[in-house]
Amino acid sequence: MQSFREQSSYHGNQQSYPQEVHSSSRIEEFSPRQAQMFQNFGGAGGGSSGTGSSSSGRRGTAAAAAAMASETSGHQGYQGFRKEAGDFYYMAGNKDTVAAGTPQPPQRRPSGPVQSYGPPQGSSFGNQYASEGHVSQFQAQHSALGGVSHYQQDYTGPFSPGSAQYQQQASSQQQQQQQQQQQQQQQQQQQQVQQLRQQLYQSHQPLPQTTGQPASGSSHLQPMQRPSTLPSSAGYQLRVGQFGQHYQSSASSSSSSSFPSPQRFSQSGQSYDGSYSVNAGSQYEGHNVGSNAQAYGTQSNYSYQPQSMKNFEQAKIPPGNQQGQQQQQQQPQPQQQQPQQQQQQQQQQQHPPQHVMQYTNAATKMPLQSQVGQYNQPEVPVRSPMQFHQNFSPISNPSPAASVVQSPSCSSTPSPLMQSGENLQCGQGNVPMSSRNRILQLMPQLSPTPSMMPSPNSHAAGFKGFGLEGVPEKRLTDPGLSSLSALSSQVANLPNTVQHMLLSDALTPQKKTSKRPSSSSKKADSCTNSEGSSQPEEQLKSPMAESLDGGCSSSSEDQGERVRQLSGQSTSSDTTYKCGASEKAGSSPTQGAQNEAPRLSTSPATRDEAASPGAKDTSLSSEGNTKVNEKTVGVIVSREAMTGRVEKSGGQDKGSQEDDPAASQRPPSNSGVKEISHTSLPQPDPPGGGSKGNKNGDNNSSNHNGEGNGPSSHSAVGPSFTGRTEPSKSPGSLRYSYKESFGSAVPRNVSGYPQYPSGQEKGDFGSHGERKGRNEKFPSLLQEVLQGYHHHPDRRYPRSAQEHQGMASGLEGTARPNILVSQTNELASRGLLNKSIGSLLENPHWGPWERKSSSTAPEMKQINLSDYPIPRKFEIEPPSSAHEPGGSLSERRSVICDISPLRQIVRDPGAHSLGHMGTDARIGRNERLNPSLSQSVILPGGLVSMETKLKSQSGQIKEEDFEQSKSQASFNKKSGDHCHPTSIKHETYRGNASPGAAAHDSISDYGPQDSRSTPMRRVPGRVGSRETMRGRSSSQYHDFAEKLKMSPGRSRGPGGDPHHMNPHMTFSERANRSSLHAPFSPNSESLASAYHTNTRAHAYGDPNTGLNSQLHYKRQMYQQQQEEYKDWASSSAQGVIAAAQHRQEGPRKSPRQQQFLDRVRSPLKNDKDGMMYGPPVGTYHDPSTQEAGRCLMSSDGLPAKSMELKHSSQKLQESCWDLSRQTSPAKSSGPPGMSNQKRYGPPHEPDGHGLAESAQSSKPSNVMLRLPGQEDHSSQNPLIMRRRVRSFISPIPSKRQSQDVKNSNADDKGRLLHPSKEGADKAYNSYSHLSHSQDIKSIPKRDSSKDLPNPDNRNCPAVTLTSPAKTKILPPRKGRGLKLEAIVQKITSPNIRRSASANSAEAGGDTVTLDDILSLKSGPPEGGTVATQEAEMEKRKCEVVSDLVSVTNQESNVEKPLPGPSEEWRGSGDDKVKTEAHVETASTGKEPSGTMTSTASQKPGGNQGRPDGSLGGAAPLIFPDSKNVAPVGILAPEANPKAEEKENDTVMISPKQESFPPKGYFPSGKKKGRPIGSVNKQKKQQQQPPPPPQPPQMPEGSADGEPKPKKQRQRRERRKPGAQPRKRKTKQAVPIVEPQEPEIKLKYATQPLDKTDAKNKSFFPYIHVVNKCELGAVCTIINAEEEEQTKLVRSRKGQRSLTPPPSSTESKVLPASSFMLQGPVVTESSVMGHLVCCLCGKWASYRNMGDLFGPFYPQDYAATLPKNPPPKRSSEMQSKVKVRHKSASNGSKTDTEEEEEQQQQKEQRSLAAHPRFKRRHRSEDCGGGPRSLSRGLPCKKAATEGSSEKTVSDTKPSVPTTSEGGPELELQIPELPLDSNEFWVHEGCILWANGIYLVCGRLYGLQEALEIAREMKCSHCQEAGATLGCYNKGCSFRYHYPCAIDADCLLHEENFSVRCPKHKPPLPCPLPPLQNKTAKGSLSTEQSERG
């Protein structure tokens, strides 16, 4: 939610915040309106509301999913929530936006936060739009509500574009259609559909499009100008740059940006309308098409394209100011626009006519795009239901929103996609026509608005030129924003996932650079693909669309491949290649200028048309129609040839251009051209577009050439961003691109390793470009894959193409949509997550990264598949190898072997030569080692998802995809390392085998990871952390990708190491992604506490977008499974296949695996060292073999170990595994394990995100290798193992086959779970990779038993993994206090449940993580109390996660220490469960099982070790690894395999159990763990005294203990040997006991203790309620164990033998005076009065006197009152009063209160023991504490308002008289219904009043005292009611108790005597004042004693 907030803030920045400000009323206003609208539109909120809901659902899909479903309640509820959360977030984040003077941002912002932007937006859409007039609505809503509307759309887009939006589009399509019909009655029915979508996305847009096109344009301009107006917001826009940027753009380019975001998301999958929106967004760079963008954005395309165009163009429209701001805004917008674009795409898909109209209205270009969008839109309407359903289902998941968007895009598009293949985006409905039309439209638009429509090219150019050149400072200020805008546009139109990835990538690495690289990449791609410039750009921008259809392939490829196509094929190829290569090489600034210059300049025509007019036409027509053919061919050629060329020119150019981008491009060598590219694409794209064009450009650069786009982009980014994004570009792009694009670009840059000096740039640009690259790459790859698949260019990467195409063609309708849905959802989720987290983390960075992650991931998925390997290969230098995978995905399978070996070899050089560039080394290694990895590295976020999806769809591709998924996950993790939270989260989903999950993972990875890492990488990453983070993250990620990819590939191929790393990488990247998810859910948890609750819900919604995707992805998965069940098994088991390959290769290439492990470990170790992949690569190469390998295996260890144990148990892997285990713990203990978390965390801890980033940056690689090694071990190992095993079932040994069988179950689940695992991994990585490791472990277990979904879901909420995950988490919640999660879960549970089943693994991993997180958060206190099994499981988790939490908290404390810990804790426990499941599941792969066990053990140990600290944590982590290493490795792989076999068998059961019961999370999975957990508990309890890690191990053992005899023994052995190693390793890092204890304390120490001695060891404050006849319920607050004991004694003795309060002075005889009884609080009374003390007339907490105690009624009167537990109610009332008066209380001194409480406890005599006193004390504790009465406890609420007549008068007179803020307090004295006979007293007043005693709950003497007091006039205040008289005889001074204190009377507490100032003892006089105060204190105590 923070991401939401921040995203909201960003979005809200422009439009949402003012709307937020105005929106609060407006939202409230909207509430009814939205209620109306929602009611009217059935949840669409009338489109406006629906959009709001959609946006809000998108954004708050997790939280708002259910609300989204009922938009009315959701929006209204969310309006309140938005108002709170959204307004909160927006207010907090968007105060500048409000300052910026855009009311829209607030609204958007409101819609942004939860569904915050939804309601305003929805309201804006429906009612506000309606009320404001549709045109006016668009304008007004653009202006006023448009921001919200945009935010809705944007947030919907960015957050869960598909989620809420799709939910709305599901219901809202109808509702929105209703609303839009209402609006569209003004517009058209076609527009209605589109407007439905658009209204959903940009309800105001459709109308303005029809009625208010100009108005919409004005609105857009208005918002655009708003962004201009938002210079202050520009800073905010930087944050917004993450998400708010397009929201800011939404403010100025509200509709365009905001709407485009949803539309982009919708369009992303839809057609590249959204992509064009992205293209427009990219063109947003060239947003010279500002009016185009506005018109574009205003129209339906304005919905998606306007956002894009408007985003980008609008950003361009205000070329200098506005554009920069718009771009800034629009960058976030693109981020959100991605979701929005999805929505827009959906809108487009839904409203193709509207799009046409919109486009027509908006601009020719817009209409063209609109038509394209419309063409898609028509398909979208057809797919709309699917989209909506998928979206709707995932709408619960924010992810589903994006996924849905993608799903619709993919789903609908894939139908069209399958129909058109190319028109995924372009031709979702109209593949060739749509694509072409869009392309043509865009081209015409480009032509008509060359400067505007150069948007694709000029968009890139304009965006770059505008944003970067035109508004270079703004661009630079908001590189992420403009990049986000451009990137977002691109990314949004890239599959949303790609967009998310791209945005995440672009944004996180560099808000601007990221965005720019994304835009640039897309633009450069588009630009490079001039024809693909408009459409390709849109497609480029819509990797989703690109991914979504063959056209998607074309589109996706349009970005990456289209650049390649343009570059490598026909004009597109030539242009792109020239542009790409030239630009990349910077050799062709003319072409670069043509492409980039148009991009840069407002010569879209020049660049678009000049650079790609022919290419555009060719590519457009080609890619529109021929795109599939030509593009495929072009893709193949472009990608292959271009990849080859790019590899060459990319290797050279990229080497030089990456060098150039890093060096030359960074310098403004291609400043103009490259600046454009740099601005738009180069920021994310120099790495992602430029770098993606260069790296991803190499990925895309195969298409893009990464050169024209990439190099150009990169160059542009480099040059333009040279100054500002040079670090960004290189770090961002390199970071992201390094991850994804940097896998391509940075790896290219790594190719020019010296350019990894770009390492800094890479760090920034890697993230950035990688995000962009991811975006591009994924779509490029996806596009390529899809297109290649459609057009057999899939031969280029048969698997990629096959995967993507298999998905595209086989499942394009469903699978492709699923992929895209998953991507879109991921994009949305990731975008949301990214936005949320990106915003949170680095608002611009996060969002864009997330989006980039999402977008780039999908794009990367496709681009990665083909492009990436090539680009990666480029970096890897075996371009042919990389090219091979790119060349053929099938080959990619082989390539995994071929490329992996090559990569490994290259990786060796990469590791060494790139060693200095941690990122490059890793990426290079990854690329080199794994072209697949390269792809994967770029793919990680998007590719994984797409790959996963494609994987799912195409067995070959699946395997490859999974590999890529893994690699992508790895890379995403690396990217995610950049932006852990989102990135990893998204990457979790992206990395998830499941397309949706994978996409989401990628999104998460890119978003959160990149976002987080990017900030960190940007900051520390760029500095040292950037290199470290980047090197670590990017490199790690790349390395992981390499390893993962290499692991399978290299395993297949020469590399045992890559093999080793590959599984690890895949799982690790998943874990990292999940960790990132969880961390973005660190961020996600902090950030996504809201966001994590929402964003994580979204992020985990990504897996659950994977759930949506699940829906889709389920469909896809299942469809893929059915269609390509083998493929699905491969896909789902692609990780398993990869793992199998890895294992296969591991045994075959065990030495190489070892080598790879060495290499991988080296990077990992380097990462461990803070640059696991950095320079230490070489350093740790040898140690890394052990430690990095261990770390790898530790993080990735279980997966890798599982895999490697599978064949390293067979071979070296086990030693590697052991090493990895040990190293993982070592990493954990040392920098590696925990260093990734801690090192990354600590090194990146400077960066709040850095920590998460660092945890994820380092962890993605290291934790990925290490913590993921634990989580990844678990999850990835078993899951990836299973997947890989499954993928490589044939090559895998029989046990692997056995696992494969399980993989079929588990892989489906595993795949589903894997996303969630990856989500968990992301969450975990984000939080702590360890947690994710655990999560992954849990996920494997959950794989089988939904444990995964639960933890994952838990992770989701806690970690912002995903609402769906959250939802899943809820059931497994185990009373974690995951109320929000529960709520969100309930809201999103249906979809999530469904998704849980389908994506149970996907969601499961996240769930586990969330559970872990939440368990950690709330679980430790709660969990212990929770079910024993749960507690046990959570104990294990707690212990494990405690370590993780300790470490994560220590390290990832920044963003998600708690969530991380919770997640980690949960992940730990769940991981254990997962480990059980995984170990069991991995039983086939005993090694994985062992790995799982090791991981689980490792996690318990390592987690606990980690909590010790990086070192301590590492040691335990290593220890768990050691556990496995010792038990498994040391004991023997044999024992481990045996245990694993048992585990596997158990896991087999577990997978089925866990997999099938989505909610079985722990019931089945955790029951496994639990029943085992019970034993584990026992063991834990037994072993708990030793180290909690052991208990976690025990749980593991227990988990594994299903085959408990051996497993438990082994685990015990592991635990014990593990404990020994753990101790030993912990000793390495920290003594295990220490980690455990901190762990226990930190994580859930009490949970395990809770079972046995939780209360003894872990004390939870609680309220002790005793029912007493007279007193009613006596509630005692026990805040401390001492209190508990004392109160137990008191309660027993004191309550029973309550002596009169005046025990000191009076006898124990009951007073003869009448008594009062405490009665029920009067809630309804004709008498209203102030609640004041009846004795002193002062209110509660007056002068810190504490709470008022009461109400006391005369005994006669009390008898007439109903007998309730008055004490409790009164306590509540008191609490209320206390709360009310807390602020009023002058000095709430907690210390005093504590002292008083202590004194009270000391001095509490019988009174203290008295229940009433206790109640008073409790209320005082509760209320008094806050008030912190000076005499805190003396306050009794005894003021009888009615009976003490003077009370009211006293109150009023005394209030004024009280100098201590009496008047203030008086003002705050609540007017409450008071009974005339009720008395409230301060404790002090009663204590000090004569003759008042509290005996047995009866207050004696109060009436008499009151009667007397009424006659007594206070000498101090002259008011009646004095109760204290001077002790001196004859002295007539009488005081109220407070007055006595004020009068400096000496209050002697021993006998409660008062001495007036005159009669104070001379000496005591000084003392008495002191004593007065002391006496006050002691008096308070005494008084409290007296009661």
Swiss-Prot record:
Phosphoserine modified-residue sites: 447, 458, 567, 588, 603, 612, 669, 900, 994, 1033, 1081, 1333, 1363, 1389, 1550, 1697
Annotated positions of the Phosphothreonine modification: 1699, 1790, 1792
Molecular-function GO term, any one: transcription cis-regulatory region binding
Principal location class: nucleus
Tissue: Expressed in brain, lung, liver, kidney and testes.
DNA-binding span(s): 1565-1579
Name of the featured protein: Transcription factor 20
Protein's organism: Mus musculus
